[in-house]
Amino acid sequence: MTGHNTHWKLWKFIKVLLFSVIFSIIALLLVATVRTFTLDVGSGLHLGKWENTTTISLQLRTQQRQNLLANFKAAIRIPTVSFTETHVNTSALQEFDGLLRSVFPKVFSSSLVRHEVVGNYSHLFTIAGTDADLEPYMLLAHIDVVPANEADGWDAPPFSAQEINGFIYGRGTIDNKQSVMGILQALEYLLEKGYTPRRTFYIGLGHDEEVNGLHGAVNIVKLLKSRGVKLLYVLDEGLAVLDGVISGLDGPAALIGISEKGQTTVKLSVSTSPGHSSMPPRESSIGILASAVRRLEENPMPRLFGYGPERSTFEHLAHKFGLPLRFIMSNLWLFSPLLSRVLERKPDTNAFVRTTTAVTMFNSGVKINIIPSYAEAYVNFRIHSAQTLQEVLELVQSTISDDRVKIEMVNGFDPLPISSHDEQSFGFQIIKKTVLGMFPQLTVAPGICVGNTDSRHYRDITQDIYRFAPSWFKPGDPQRFHGVNERISIQNYEEIVQFYFQLMQNNDIMNLPPPHSSQHEL
């Protein structure tokens, strides 16, 4: 009888346990399902509740279209290449200075605009507003470009600005002369129409962004700091409009960068005794270093998906995916581990999951029959927002775990702070309003820049740095960035001018609408 009672109690316990598990699973699925069909993180804006400041419209005439296109092409034809921090094309930068002065006469002659050359080749414009109580903002772009070689397979010479099927080809068309010329062209049109801003703003054009901005952006910031300038927000290049680039996403999306990954380059070196190849030692400097590099590649940095801005990106986009992706992305609190394992399979999405490891240089040896005494390698890490530079260096040390390998940091910096992007974030909401006002079909989401810009130098004078330009990228276009056949459509360049024209006026809004004004109506 006792045995029977014991079995009965055990069976009762198992039934209760099974019921609890089943109930928990059903509850989880119910919560996840409800969240899937209700999560829609600020997909649009209710424009009726916004203060209306736009009084000037831009209807481009045929002659204006021809002129703005000619101005842009002239900018592309000037090879403002930055090779290294100490080697830039100074004659091209001087020529570019002359171009700006000739094609934007209102900008350089208006009493509202103060122009200063900084660091010999960079430009700072101060556009005076009528209300000194409004905190100023700043628009950034950069004049310099990376090198380009026609022999790499360009369809047109990289500094020809040649038109092919409605596109302008050339280095700088999407990085970043479309913003340089677009910003100044928009300001030129506004000044021609008698525009006076309510809110003071600045325009900063760096000349060495591609080589860290140490003479351009750094000196612009020093000048502004010396004057006690504090900025409401900064808008620089970074992310773009992605149309068909994100697999499974219904419609195009505008991603506004709210942070950048950190970065460090580490030098690994091994020194041993040299020798002749006829009497090789058990281990060589090359072999020891190769083993260290292999350990770094075979043991990637930990998965951190969901602990940085990428979570907000996926949640903002979730409602534009079909099932089952919508179900998964709407419930990252439940599915982050699963999704991270899927994303890490491809290099372009693995960058969202972790700090990436890239072996970029490996040098050793002077002759085929001499065993070298020295070998060195350089490894670049792009640091996830949830990690620090110090944590990465410690993981490198523990992963290699070989005292014979000397580890030195060449350079590095932590991930950039995450800029605000909620309903009361002035900069983010103004940019979003401008994007949706022009392209109501877009979904706008915050994003993370896996590359770096010189906007990081502005951290001391603003809390919010955003990285976006309305360049449209279709499948294959992201590879043109710093690559072969960089190009922009004529229509898209006109849209960029329109975007900045509208953005400057939208920034004259004094206050954002009350919270919870976001609707799904735009």
From Swiss-Prot:
Note the superkingdom of the native organism: Eukaryota
The EC number(s) attached to this protein equal 3.5.1.114, 3.5.1.14
* Swiss-Prot/TrEMBL catalytic activity: an N-acyl-L-amino acid + H2O = an L-alpha-amino acid + a carboxylate; an N-acyl-aromatic L-alpha-amino acid + H2O = an aromatic L-alpha-amino acid + a carboxylate; N-(5Z,8Z,11Z,14Z)-eicosatetraenoyl-glycine + H2O = (5Z,8Z,11Z,14Z)-eicosatetraenoate + glycine; N-hexadecanoyl-L-phenylalanine + H2O = hexadecanoate + L-phenylalanine
Where are the membrane-spanning stretches?
none
How activity is controlled: the entry says:
Lipoproteins are powerful coactivators of PM20D1 activity in vitro and NAA biosynthesis in vivo.
Q: Which GO terms describe its cellular component?
A: extracellular space
Known pathway = Amino-acid metabolism; Energy metabolism; electron transfer; Lipid metabolism; fatty acid metabolism
Q: What does this protein do?
A: Secreted enzyme that regulates the endogenous N-fatty acyl amino acid (NAAs) tissue and circulating levels by functioning as a bidirectional NAA synthase/hydrolase. It condenses free fatty acids and free amino acids to generate NAAs and bidirectionally catalyzes the reverse hydrolysis reaction. Some of these NAAs stimulate oxidative metabolism via mitochondrial uncoupling, increasing energy expenditure in a UPC1-independent manner. Thereby, this secreted protein may indirectly regulate whole body energy expenditure.
Recorded protein name is N-fatty-acyl-amino acid synthase/hydrolase PM20D1.2
